[in-house]
UniProtKB/Swiss-Prot annotation:
Residues at which substrate binds: D108, W197, E198, R199, F200, E201, Q202, V203, F204, H286, G319, D435
Compartment(s) of residence: Secreted
Organism: Danio rerio (Zebrafish)
Protein name: Adenosine deaminase 2-A
Name of the encoding gene: ada2a
Cofactor(s) for this UniProt protein: Zn(2+)
GO cellular component: extracellular space
Function: Adenosine deaminase that may contribute to the degradation of extracellular adenosine, a signaling molecule that controls a variety of cellular responses. May play a role in the regulation of cell proliferation.
Gene3D superfamilies xrefs: Metal-dependent hydrolases
Length: 503
């Protein structure tokens, strides 16, 4: 964490001192002082490494140098092409072992690997598949053949289908392709943002019938927590649509059932993994809803928050920002909690756009005016200096999701990501993964690697990684005492990680 005003005064003073004494031959001592001051402002720049950490940092810098000097630099490449190289990197291997704290920006239907979804869930009894006219698939669990619909004229029991065909591996692979964005040639497959977003939202529709089956819903969440835990994450905040879940006989469960199920699964997972801190839900709705629907949804969010205070963290809008309604359109609905004296924290997606000067481009400012707790993505923040300063002074962090921003075509080369500037300035932020399963990424390690290597090059060090991990807990919605306990637990894990990495 940076002391804003003292740091700024030191910066201005040193600049004036240097300029006042410029005589054509710069003083090397002042140059060194400027370099040191700039380094201190970076994310992690004010963290003092102990002797063991310094040894590990020396090792890390050598590993980084190797990746930087390799013929292909992964952050400069599309993730789908770079993943193979990243997986072979010793830096990535170290980051995987590193305790990363919390994942604060993750979506419910994209947190579990699609391999598990296909090879576990679609092999369960009573799972039906439909091959649609749009060359996609739909799934549903049913005690008998499901009724036909406008998008599915014929359903096939998957168990029977697998018994009839010889190559079940190819069938499973086709399902996996329908559940991810991965392709060998992403530039050709997704020539623009609208194309990739259309495919992106289609993926969620494919997963919908699987994940909303009530028994799978619970198993899916448990598996998601397990996969994040295995990636050395101790706490998760999940953006969740909380759709109706269904039973085998077609009965539907409401949002209260889903929240209670989340609470049950999280408690069960914590019982089995005592060092896991927990998980909370940020209730979300698509930003294409109208004003009347927004009022109803915010009222629903307040009820959920009242009924499930331990698991319900707050509210957000999701969906392609450029094609959705701007936050200001929902001003009446978003003002309801304050008008009623109710605390409903907001966690708005804002600035996930490169459309400067549009109504959507004002979402960053409006998010702060509505007192958002964190800002999802904030890709456009660097183009709004006043809003950026507001966010810094309000200590509102940006949830940066590097791979998502690249795959959804906001940036091609991650060295050019605006977060590189934010981290150089020590702006409050966290690194998260958004939709790792859809991108074929690990829970968080791939995004950490891309940020660490792409945003700062050789200037980032072990202190950068340590502060990012600490930030993830500092900016979580954990109550103060639990937050302090979580940070203490993280530091114990961190010391163990440093020790073991030096063996």
């Amino acid at each position: 964490m940076h002391v804003l005003f003292l740091g700024d005064l030191m910066w201005i003073y040193l600049l004036l001192l240097c300029c006042a004494s410029c005589n054509g031959r710069p003083d090397p001592r002042k140059r060194d002082a400027l370099i040191g001051l700039e380094a201190s402002r970076r994310t992690g720049g004010d963290i003092t490494l102990n002797e063991r950490e310094k040894l590990l940092d020396g090792k890390l810098q050598k590993l980084k140098q190797h990746d930087m000097e390799a013929g292909q630099f992964p952050p400069s490449m599309h993730f789908f092409k770079a993943k193979r190289l990243i997986d072979q990197s010793p830096v990535f291997n170290l980051i995987q072992k590193m305790p990363k704290g919390a994942a604060l920006h993750v979506h419910d239907f994209a947190m579990v690997s699609v391999d598990w979804l296909v090879k576990n869930v679609t092999y369960r009894e009573n799972c039906y598949v439909c091959f649609t006219d749009k060359q996609t698939v739909q799934f549903i669990f049913s005690s008998g053949p499901p009724a036909s619909s406008s998008y599915c004229s014929s359903w096939t029991l998957l168990r029977s289908l697998r018994e009839k065909i010889k190559n079940t591996t190819e069938l499973d692979n086709s399902f996996i392709r329908n559940l991810t964005l991965f392709t060998e040639d992403p530039d050709r497959a997704y020539p623009n943002q609208d194309t990739v977003w259309e495919r992106f939202e289609q993926v969620f529709l494919v997963a919908y019938g699987l994940v909303t089956y009530a028994p799978v819903f619970k198993d899916y969440l448990y598996e998601g927590l397990r996969q994040f835990y295995e990636d050395n994450i101790m706490y998760v905040e999940i953006r969740a649509l909380l759709p109706q879940t269904y039973e085998l006989d077609g009965r539907l469960n409401d949002k209260d059932w889903s929240m209670a199920a989340c609470q049950e699964v999280v408690n069960q997972f914590k019982k089995h993994h005592p060092d896991f801190i927990g998980a909370r839900v940020i209730f979300t709705v698509h930003r294409k809803i109208n004003a009347t629907e927004a009022v109803k949804t915010v009222e629903e969010a307040m009820i959920l928050r009242r009924n499930f205070p331990d698991v319900m963290a707050g509210f957000d809008f999701v969906g392609q920002e450029d094609l959705g309604r701007p936050l200001w359109y929902f001003k009446d609905a978003l003002s309801l909690p304050e008008d009623k004296g109710f605390n409903l924290p907001y966690f708005f997606h804002a600035g996930e756009t490169d459309s400067q000067g549009t109504d959507v481009d004002q979402n960053l400012m409006d998010a702060l005016l509505f007192n958002t707790t964190r800002i999802g993505h904030g890709f456009a923040l660097a183009r709004h200096p006043v809003v950026k300063e507001m966010a810094r002074k309000m200590d509102v962090p940006i949830e940066v999701c590097p791979i998502s921003n690249q795959v959804l075509k906001l940036v091609s080369d991650l060295r050019d990501h605006p977060a590189a500037v934010l981290m150089a300035e020590g702006h409050p932020l966290v690194i998260s993964s958004d939709d790792p399963a859809v991108f074929g990424a690990t829970a968080l390690s791939h995004d950490f690697y891309e940020a660490f290597m792409g945003f700062g090059g050789m200037s980032f060090n072990l202190g950068t990684l340590k502060e990012l991990a600490l930030n993830s807990l500092r900016y979580s919605t954990l109550p103060s005492q639990r937050k302090e306990e979580a940070i203490d637990a993280l530091l114990v894990k961190w010391d163990k990680f440093v020790w073991e990495s030096l063996l």
